[in-house]
C-alpha cells in the first residue's frame, strides 16, 4: 500500500498529514486558512490522492508558517509513500484551463528537488490569503517530496483562478507521474537504477 502518515511539531505549528497515493481524491483538510484548505482539496481531488491534513499554527502572526510547514509535511508524506518509486511513470505534464487562465505543470518524480515557478499575481491577496504563499507552499512541498516541478501560468487575470489553476495543473501532472505503469514490471524508471536523488 502506497500510503504514509507524518506528524510535525515546532514552536510555530503542529501538523498531521496522511496520504494514500492509490485513493479516490478524498480530502479532509483543516489548516485554519480557508482558501488554502480549498487549494489542498483541489490537489487531492485532481491527483486522486487521498489527503488528510490537520494543522494548527501561529495564525495570530500570519499564515506563512502554517502554509509552508504544511507543504513540508505533505512533501515528506508523499516521498515516504512513494518508497523507491519502482514501476511509476515518473514523468508527466498537464495544461490546465480555468476560465481566462491557462497554466501548465511538468513533473519529474526524480528524487532531485527543484522548482521553477513562473506565475505572477496582480493582487497581493485572495481574501485574507497572501498570494506569495502559493509559491512558498510549492517550494516546501517539492523540496521535501523530492520532485522536479515546473509551473508556469501562460496568461490569466483573476488571482483566484491563477492560484487554483496552479494547484490543479500540479495535481493532474502528479496523478499521471505517480501512476504505476504495468509495462515497467516493477522496475525503477531510471538507467541509474535509483531515484533516491
Swiss-Prot record:
UniProt xrefs under Pfam families: IGPD (PF00475)
EC number: 4.2.1.19
Reactions accelerated catalytically: D-erythro-1-(imidazol-4-yl)glycerol 3-phosphate = 3-(imidazol-4-yl)-2-oxopropyl phosphate + H2O
Subcellular location: Cytoplasm
SUPFAM superfamilies: Ribosomal protein S5 domain 2-like (SSF54211)
Pathway: Amino-acid biosynthesis; L-histidine biosynthesis; L-histidine from 5-phospho-alpha-D-ribose 1-diphosphate: step 6/9
Gene3D superfamilies, sorted: Imidazole glycerol phosphate dehydratase, domain 1
Keyword Cytoplasm: yes
Gene Ontology CC terms, in alphabetical order: cytoplasm
Highest taxon, organism lineage: Bacteria
Key words of the record: Amino-acid biosynthesis, Cytoplasm, Histidine biosynthesis, Lyase
InterPro entries attached to this UniProt entry: IGPD_sf, ImidazoleglycerolP_deHydtase, ImidazoleglycerP_deHydtase_CS, Ribosomal_Su5_D2-typ_SF
Gene Ontology molecular-function annotations: imidazoleglycerol-phosphate dehydratase activity
UniProt record, GO biological process: L-histidine biosynthetic process
Xref: HAMAP family: HisB
Family indicated by similarity: Belongs to the imidazoleglycerol-phosphate dehydratase family.
NCBIfam families on file: PRK00951.1-1 (NF002106), PRK00951.1-5 (NF002109), PRK00951.1-6 (NF002110), PRK00951.2-1 (NF002111), PRK00951.2-4 (NF002114), PRK00951.2-6 (NF002116)
Protein name: Imidazoleglycerol-phosphate dehydratase
Gene label: hisB
